């Protein structure tokens, strides 16, 4: 992320829950007043989600992480869809993609996350079974290529040597 006078070019976020409009919950699971789990909170993700020119969300594709609606709005995606984001005055363009171990979700015209790509060995049925809403496929859904040995080396040795993400 590069920032100058709140001009954030690109941000990478994660969260405990991501809903069908790319909203992120990193605050509580369950009712706010009596949560099942209290989480760390925004930690700056709210500002990144609201102001970044481009924002990408990275998370494992698990049913518990992909409810139809988040329990709490920590960071704004496309809120309730449509022009809700613009109506609230949130400047950034919203999440460009949600990257998971199964595939890549991208917003459609309404701001709803749809399956834009599947990774090798993964199926739409597998993605749907791990998503809490009726997941749609993008009209031009593609299949990602397996990484080359050199790409894996760079990821494992240079970008993520402690294996936090891979």
Language model features: what each stretch is:
Residues 4-136, 147:
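Conserved phosphate- and dinucleotide-binding cores of soluble alpha/beta proteins
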Residues 134, 138-166:
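A conserved C-terminal secondary-structure "cap"
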């Amino acid at each position: 992320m590069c920032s100058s006078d709140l001009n954030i070019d690109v941000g990478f976020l994660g969260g405990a829950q991501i809903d069908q409009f790319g909203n992120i919950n990193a605050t509580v699971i369950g009712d706010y007043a009596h949560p099942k789990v209290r989480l760390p909170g925004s930690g700056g993700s709210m500002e990144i989600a609201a102001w970044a020119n481009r924002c990408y969300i990275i998370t494992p594709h698990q049913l518990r992480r992909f409810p139809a609606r988040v329990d709490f709005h920590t960071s704004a995606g496309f809120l309730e869809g449509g022009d809700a984001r613009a109506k609230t005055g949130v400047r950034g363009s919203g999440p460009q993609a949600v990257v998971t171990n199964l595939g890549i979700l991208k917003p459609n015209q309404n701001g709803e996350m749809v399956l834009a790509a599947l990774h090798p060995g993964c199926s739409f049925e597998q993605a749907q079974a791990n998503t809490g809403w009726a997941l749609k496929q993008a009209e031009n859904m593609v299949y990602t290529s397996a990484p080359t040995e050199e790409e894996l080396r760079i990821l494992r040795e240079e970008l993520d040597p402690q294996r936090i993400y891979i």
